[in-house]
Each structure stands twice: as C-alpha cells, then as structure tokens.
UniProtKB/Swiss-Prot annotation:
Annotated S-S bridges: none
Phylogenetic lineage: Bacteria, Pseudomonadati, Bacteroidota, Cytophagia, Cytophagales
GO biological process: DNA recombination; DNA repair
Catalytic activity: ATP + H2O = ADP + phosphate + H(+)
Source superkingdom: Bacteria
Region feature Head domain (RuvB-H), mapped onto this chain: 259-342
Protein name, per record: Holliday junction branch migration complex subunit RuvB
GO molecular function list: ATP binding; ATP hydrolysis activity; four-way junction DNA binding; four-way junction helicase activity
NCBIfam families recorded: PRK00080.1 (NF000868), ruvB (TIGR00635)
Entry's family note: Belongs to the RuvB family.
The keyword Zinc-finger is assigned to this record: no
Length: 342
C-alpha cells in the first residue's frame, strides 16, 4: 500500500486528486515547513543570485521519497521568478531528448530532473558542458560526413533530485554547486503540516487526530497528506465531517497502517526475515523473492524507515532484524548462543 503513497503524482492520483495535491504544496520558502538548515541556506543562495542577476548554482536534492524534493524545486523556481521545466532521468533516453529541453530554456530558467541517478551515461556526459559552459555539441549527419556544431544555451539552473545519491557518478556530482540532503520529519512538525493541509481542504481536524496521523506517517509529508485525504473520506462517511481521534484511528486501521506507522509490506518483510531466515542475516535479493517485491523498491522505499526506526540493520552479510522488530511483532527473540568459556 505505501508504495502507492510514494509514487510520483502522475502515477498516483486521478486528475481531480492531482489538483488537490498541487493545492497542498507550499509555494514559497515561508510556507515550507521543516528542513530549516537547508531552507536557511537556499534563501541566501537564491537572494544572492538574484542580486547579482546570475543563475543560481546547480542544485542537488537527495534523500528518501516524499520529503519535498519536487516541492522545493518549484519553490526555488518561484523565488527566482523563473519558469521551470520538469522531466526525469528515465525519460531522457538520448541526447536529442535533453537538447530539446535545454535549447528551449530562457535565461535563469530552472530545469528539474527527477531520478537523476537513472540518466544513461551518454545523456549524462552530454549534460556536462551544458552545466559548466552553457553549451552543447550537436552531431549532424553520420558516418564519414558526421560533424558537430556547438550551440550556446541561455544560462540556467539544473536541479537534480534523487533517492540514491550514491549512484551518481563523481563527475556529475561535482558539477552541483549546492548539495542538500533532506531528512525525515518528526511528529510535531508533521502535525503542523497535517493541520495546514486540513485547512486548505476545508476539513476540520482535532489536534489529537492530526498528531495521530502525523506520528504514523513515517516522517514523510507526502504520506501524511495522503493519509489525511483518506481519513477525510472516513470522516465524511462515518462521522460529521470533522476528523476526530476516533475517526483517525478507524481510518488508519482500515488502511493497514499500524500503531508505529508500519504497513503490510513493512511487517511482511520483518516477519519473513524472522520466520524464514531466523532473523537474518539474509541478502536483499532473497528477501525480495520471498515477499514478491522488487529489490530496488525494498531498498528505496521500505528499508530506509525500517533502519531509521531501528527495526532492521544492514551488516556485511546481509539484513538482520533487531530486538525491536521482535518486540513489535510480539515474537520471542532466539536465545543467544553461549560462548566457549561459559
């Protein structure tokens, strides 16, 4: 279920829900909650670039899904009073795809590339000269008649977003002048986000209910907003339209989001490691096969929170559950084997 919560907007929402999702997104630095250090720095960098009349340095935003990388990119564009073009790494299959975007950028525009770690190597190399010198080389003809011409580009800012910064090549990473990692949110801050979103949705919500949704949202604003929208449905049908603590708990139980914010797949991963592999260590690909999920999805979507909260750990030999996982699942940990001298 939670993988749906973490998909991109185009994959996840109907046309009506897309409009609601966009309406919930903050449009300025002042509206954006959390990530205070990053915001403080970005305000300075954007303000200085505007004063000098220069494009903002290229920006790399990385961190787990749903923390606001796309939202921040749009905010940066708004604060620069510029237009933004949005694409993603897998879409840019050949240099011509990238060239079409770059040549249509106006001065100080923003080009946002989501999942930039998935750029193929040919397109990535083509991007280097565009980022450094605002120039690209285009090949004309082929074979013996092949020749290249250089085309100048308007100065622009590239914002790359990724959940897996470690997969970026060193040459690409080095070309970003601004590098920011977004971190998970605490429940108190997420409560503010839930309350703000409920106001925008014209849905009354009690503070206790907002906190209940927030603390089960895995530290992720996108999940908090999605749970809020679904809880609003329950309040409308099973209540009087106000989201109370009781309604929130009913909705979250129906959505299979447990007391600690873990969903079916989270618990399935932990249970599988305990029941089939004696708590680990076990390899990622083996876990993926056992739970019928893609290894990449487990690594990007599920593992970060399980590790962050202390249910799972990575070792040199594979993944292992922790005592907290046994406690959460109400299981008895295996007895520790004795040492040689006991």
């Amino acid at each position: 279920m939670r993988e749906d919560y973490l998909k991109s907007d185009d994959e996840q929402f109907t046309s009506g829900e897309k409009e609601i999702e966009r309406a919930l997104r903050p449009l300025s630095f002042d509206d954006f909650a959390g990530q205070d250090k990053i915001l403080e720095n970005l305000k300075i960098f954007v303000g200085a670039a505007k004063q000098r009349g220069e494009p903002l340095d290229h920006v790399l935003l990385h961190g787990p899904p749903g923390l606001g990388k796309t939202t921040l990119s749009n905010i940066i564009s708004n604060e620069l009073n510029s237009n933004i073009k949005i694409t993603s790494g897998p879409v840019l299959e050949k240099p011509g795809d990238l060239a079409g975007l770059l040549t249509n950028l106006q001065t100080n525009d923003v080009l946002f590339i989501d999942e930039i770690h998935r750029l193929n190597s040919v397109v990535e190399e083509y991007l280097y000269s565009a980022m450094e010198d605002y120039k690209i080389d285009i090949m004309l003809d082929s074979g013996a008649n092949a020749r290249s011409i250089q085309i100048g580009l308007n100065p622009f800012t590239l914002i790359g977003a990724t959940t897996r910064a470690g997969l970026l090549t060193s040459p690409l990473r080095a070309r970003f002048g601004i590098n920011a990692r977004l971190e998970y949110y605490d429940a108190k801050l997420l409560t503010r986000i839930v309350q703000r979103s409920s106001d925008l949705l014209n849905t009354p919500i009690l503070e206790t209910a907002a906190f209940e949704i927030a603390r089960r949202s895995r530290g992720t604003p996108r999940i908090a907003n999605n749970l809020l929208r679904r809880t609003r449905d329950f309040a409308q049908i099973k209540g009087d339209g106000t989201i109370t603590l009781e309604i929130a708990r009913i909705a979250l139980q129906a959505l299979n989001v447990d007391h600690n914010g873990l969903d079916d797949m989270d618990n399935r991963i932990l249970t599988t490691i305990i029941d089939k592999f004696k708590g680990g260590p076990v390899g990622l690909s083996t876990i993926a096969t056992a739970v019928s999920e893609e290894a990449e999805t487990i690594e990007e979507v599920y593992e970060p929170f399980l590790i962050q909260e202390g249910y799972l750990k990575r070792t040199s030999r594979g993944r292992e559950v922790t005592p907290l996982a046994y406690k959460h699942l109400q299981r008895t940990p295996p007895a520790q084997s004795g040492t040689l001298f006991e």
